Curated annotation (Swiss-Prot):
The lineage of its organism: Viruses, Riboviria, Orthornavirae, Negarnaviricota, Polyploviricotina. This is Nucleoprotein. SUPFAM superfamilies: flu NP-like (SSF161003). Its main location: virion. Late in virus-infected cells, may be cleaved from a 56-kDa protein to a 53-kDa protein by a cellular caspase. This cleavage might be a marker for the onset of apoptosis in infected cells or have a specific function in virus host interaction. Belongs to the influenza viruses nucleoprotein family. HAMAP family: INFV_NCAP. InterPro entries: Flu_NP.
Length: 498
């Protein structure tokens, strides 16, 4: 559990490691990446993909999804117990795109899950290598975060669409373990808890009996994960109150929505990792790069270096802008969907535009889309600088949370001041007098009111030249403060509803 008294680094969460030193962590993360790469090469061989087809991000997504589905034990068990027409619970597959006579063709493939598991284990020295599976889940989650807005899901659970910057990881499966919990935003955790509370209100047996006991344990665990994300004593105390409730109901629901709103200013700590598609790792391994020997980190320069030297292609619909498609994937690769656009633009070296201005739909192609008119292009995933990924939430004075950055959740540890209109945020707190009035609430509101917009987050932190591998010379960018850089605000992105 992230930061439950045990401070483990991401890489340790990522590799289920006990305490390891930096070199061991880099090696075990490298081992995980190498395993994904070897698996991908083997799958491309099985499917007889050309080099170009193997570097197509849509093919990568299908192959990643197949292995995740092959290892989804709960769903596999469910499918076997509830057979549905036309679905073989023992098989998995998806669309593979091939270039035939100058045109892109869609081919639906089907494999035995057992066979996929065999190939995966073989690529990972016989292990199940769950860390590698989680890594792919986080990549898919980051891609969803950059592609879709969760307004509808927020409204359904009684939260405000303005809280979209708290929704990182909202599409991650529950089985994604500690590494998955670390990258979930405050809003995501709140939403999961609210769903449980609502079920408990509607279904009297939800908390009862043997099953109810398991439910209760899951509820308390989720409360602890969320508590660990908050950085102020008052927010944590409120989480204890929510967790210890005998019969979670309306009061807890109110407390949680209050906490979610408070997280817009008193930011939670949410991890950010650069998880790349398998079609980046595969060719790197094929070219002879030994990730385990060289070591790898998800939060340092390594993903940037890897992307500088990678060719990735994508299918492009007739009216889409390839540069915009590239931006979408770049943001997903660096988990930057909720980062300030000014910071992202500086690091990338080209202007990063808000979601509503992008002429591109998602990366996945629906089965009913016409392939006749489909083109393809190179994704531009390179960057001008690199920066360290953060998990602090950008609160200004260490030890105690203060003003985090509104409407964004920082990804990069780079100095910026906080453009925000406190009145807008505080307006969200008036008029809601339900739930408990408590010292904790008063304290939280007091902290928020005293947050100063002119504060600077990540004081003295900067970006680095790509030649500066040891991060020796930080370049502290100065930003034009006139516009605040939220990606989703004023937006009409598609909804994610599966």
């Amino acid at each position: 559990m992230a930061s439950q008294g045990t401070k483990r680094s991401y890489e340790q969460m990522e590799t289920d490691g006990e305490r390891q030193n930096a070199t061991e962590i880099r090696a075990s993360v490298g081992k995980m990446i190498g395993g994904i790469g070897r698996f991908y090469i083997q799958m491309c061989t099985e499917l007889k993909l050309s080099d170009y087809e193997g570097r197509l991000i849509q093919n990568s997504l299908t192959i990643e999804r197949m292995v995740l589905s092959a290892f989804d034990e709960r769903r596999n068990k469910y499918l076997e117990e509830h057979p549905s027409a036309g679905k073989d619970p023992k098989k998995t597959g998806g669309p593979i795109y091939k270039r035939v006579d100058g045109k892109w063709m869609r081919e639906l493939i089907l494999y035995d899950k057992e066979e996929i598991r065999r190939i995966w284990r073989q690529a990972n020295n016989g292990d199940d290598a769950t860390a590698g599976l989680t890594h792919m889940m986080i990549w898919h989650s980051n891609l969803n975060d950059a592609t879709y807005q969760r307004t509808r899901a927020l409204v359904r659970t009684g939260m405000d669409p303005r809280m979209c910057s708290l929704m990182q990881g909202s599409t991650l499966p529950r089985r994604s373990g500690a590494a998955g919990a670390a990258v979930k935003g405050v809003g995501t955790m709140v939403m999961e808890l609210i769903r449980m509370i609502k079920r408990g209100i509607n279904d009297r047996n939800f908390w009862r009996g043997e099953n109810g006991r398991k439910t209760r344990i899951a509820y308390e665990r989720m409360c602890n994960i969320l508590k660990g994300k908050f950085q102020t004593a008052a927010q944590r105390a409120m989480m204890d109150q929510v967790r210890e409730s005998r019969n979670p109901g309306n009061a807890e629901f109110e407390d949680l929505t209050f906490l979610a709103r408070s997280a817009l200013i008193l930011r939670g700590s949410v991890a950010h990792k650069s998880c790349l598609p398998a079609c980046v790792y595969g060719p790197a391994v094929a070219s002879g790069y030994d990730f385990e020997r060289e070591g790898y980190s998800l939060v340092g320069i390594d993903p940037f270096k890897l992307l500088q030297n990678s060719q990735v292609y994508s299918l492009i619909r007739p009216n889409e802008n390839p540069a915009h498609k590239s931006q979408l994937v770049w943001m997903a690769c660096h988990s930057a969907a909720f980062e300030d656009l000014r910071v992202s633009s500086f690091i990338r070296g080209t202007r990063v535009v808000p979601r509503g201005k992008l002429s591109t739909r998602g990366v996945q192609i629906a089965s009913n889309e016409n392939m006749e008119t489909m083109g393809s292009s190179t994704l531009e995933l390179r960057s001008r600088y690199w920066a360290i990924r953060t998990r602090s939430g950008g609160n200004t004075n260490q030890q105690r949370a203060s003003a985090g950055q509104i409407s964004i959740q920082p990804t990069f540890s780079v100095q910026r001041n906080l453009p925000f209109d406190r009145t807008t945020i505080m307006a969200a707190f008036t008029g809601n007098t339900e739930g408990r009035t408590s010292d904790m609430r008063t304290e939280i509101i007091r902290m928020m009111e005293s947050a100063r917009p002119e504060d600077v987050s990540f004081q003295g932190r900067g970006v680095f030249e790509l030649s500066d591998e040891k991060a020796a010379n930080p370049i502290v960018p100065s930003f034009d403060m006139s516009n605040e850089g939220s990606y989703f605000f004023g937006d009409n992105a598609e909804e994610y509803d599966n």
